[in-house]
Amino acid sequence: MGNGKQPWLSLGYETFALHGAAGLKIEAMAKQLGISKSSFYHHFADTEIFITHLLQYHLERCEIIAIKEANAKSIDPELIDILVEFKWDLLFNRQLRFSRNQAEYIQVVNKTNELVGNAFVMLWVKELNLNFSPEKIAALFELALENFYLQINSDNLHHTWLSEYFQNLKRLAKAME
């Protein structure tokens, strides 16, 4: 990836994470970056191609998250540290989930679930020591994941909130046993 693209991708990624595709205003982003908007069109041609680059960048970031999650030994603090470190990636994924009416977004959400979901589920099952069938664990995780993405925002993705969230999730899961 060329250096000229990286500032656009970094700002675009964060902007998409906060506002979705509708927030990708080229002129406003050019002003923030202090470069001409013609630079954007030189690198990406149009917003659709730019979003494709952002989706690819997101998948690359999720591969890194998956490796880190696979090495985590606990939810608190290890997994929470990872989630805080990759805050913008979670928020980007949240926007994709909210716009699942677009086929390209659905594909990326499904791929990210495969990448990051498995390591997280294994850690969660180990730490909670649940006596659930694999089907029940998968269903509970799916609900928890949807709930998680509905609740997160740029202000609450920090250690305190995440710790409380996972404690509550643990309490709910134990109540279902």
Q: Can you describe what each PLM-predicted range is?
A:
Residues 1-5:
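Short, Lys/Arg-enriched anionic-surface-contact patches
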Residues 7, 11, 15-49, 53:
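Helix-turn-helix
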Residues 11-19, 61-69, 143-151:
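Solvent-exposed, amphipathic alpha-helical segments
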Residues 32-35, 43, 90-99:
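Basic/polar phosphate-binding segments, predominantly the helix-turn-helix DNA-binding elements
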Residues 44, 50-58, 109-112, 116:
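Alpha-helical DNA-contacting segments of helix-turn-helix folds
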Residues 53, 64-92:
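Hydrophobic alpha-helical connector segments
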Residues 92, 153-154:
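A structural signal for repeat-array scaffolds
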Residues 101-142, 149, 156, 160-170:
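Amphipathic alpha-helical packing segments from all-alpha helical-bundle domains
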